[in-house]
């Protein structure tokens, strides 16, 4: 996350920090203020995955047992979740102790998912743009608001505009990407929101840590992927093929033609220069 806009920005060693203690103390210090905005980055799950996957597994290997051990890999990931649950409980408890829980808006979200070996070439995340790393959760607790589920596709870039609207700063700056989730929450928006994703892997079949080289556009359960380094296309119907196992790309398909136009739009808008075939 960028430092822009924050009064204070702290970096710490995830190998040694106690997240519950550190973050709870920050909340206690800020609770004396009338208003505050706080972003807490819990990376214990990331740390555990780095220890067990990045440091122990050969990232460039595609013919080892990792890709045949989906159940074991999934169970390993699940074993990290109780610690995450305890962390969240500690944060909520701290808000209660500070007597600010009933006037605090809480937003929990993940920035990405992770691979458990679904696709050869990716053992962690950031290599490809398949849904197992794109789909994430977001929980927003607003005191006094009845719980609702948003089932339509939305994006993490929609979180910031939502915060702006919640806090009464709904007038959107043209430089801000994303849209408030209130239209979806109040059922005033019927269409899914189009998704654009880019990544550049640290490892995998075509690593590109200095610039993105894999891109995708996704809308209405149709998904187009462009892999720039090998210059290959993929297209998936996610209703019929939710695990993205059957690439049905054909350049003459109308869905493909339309999604290519949208991909070009996003590349231009974000000043990304690639040799799009």
What are these language model-derived features?
Residues 1-277:
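Catalytic domains that recognize anionic headgroups
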């Amino acid at each position: 996350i960028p430092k822009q806009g924050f009064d204070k920005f702290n970096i710490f060693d995830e190998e040694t920090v106690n997240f519950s203690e550190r973050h709870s103390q920050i909340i206690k210090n800020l609770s004396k203020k009338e208003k505050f905005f706080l972003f807490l980055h819990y990376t214990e799950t990331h740390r555990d995955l780095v220890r067990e996957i990045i440091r122990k597994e050969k990232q460039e290997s595609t013919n080892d047992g990792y890709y045949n051990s989906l159940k074991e890999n999934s169970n390993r990931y699940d074993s990290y979740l109780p610690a995450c649950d305890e962390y969240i409980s500690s944060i909520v408890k701290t808000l209660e102790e500070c007597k600010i829980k009933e006037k605090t808006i809480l937003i929990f979200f993940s920035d990405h998912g992770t691979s458990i070996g679904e696709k050869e070439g990716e053992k962690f995340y950031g290599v490809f743009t398949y849904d197992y790393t794109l789909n994430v959760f977001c929980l927003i607790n607003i005191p006094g608001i009845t719980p609702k589920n948003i089932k339509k596709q939305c994006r993490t870039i929609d979180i910031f505009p939502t915060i702006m609207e919640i806090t009464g700063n709904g007038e959107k700056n043209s430089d801000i990407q994303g849209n408030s989730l209130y239209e979806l929450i109040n059922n005033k928006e019927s269409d899914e929101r189009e998704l654009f994703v880019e990544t550049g892997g640290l490892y995998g079949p075509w690593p590109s840590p200095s610039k993105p080289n894999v891109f995708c556009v996704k809308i209405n359960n149709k998904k187009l992927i462009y892999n720039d380094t090998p210059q290959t296309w993929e297209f998936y119907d996610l209703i019929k093929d939710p695990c993205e196992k059957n690439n049905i790309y054909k350049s003459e398909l109308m869905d493909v033609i339309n999604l290519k136009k949208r991909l070009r739009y996003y590349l231009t808008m974000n000043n990304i220069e690639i040799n799009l075939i």
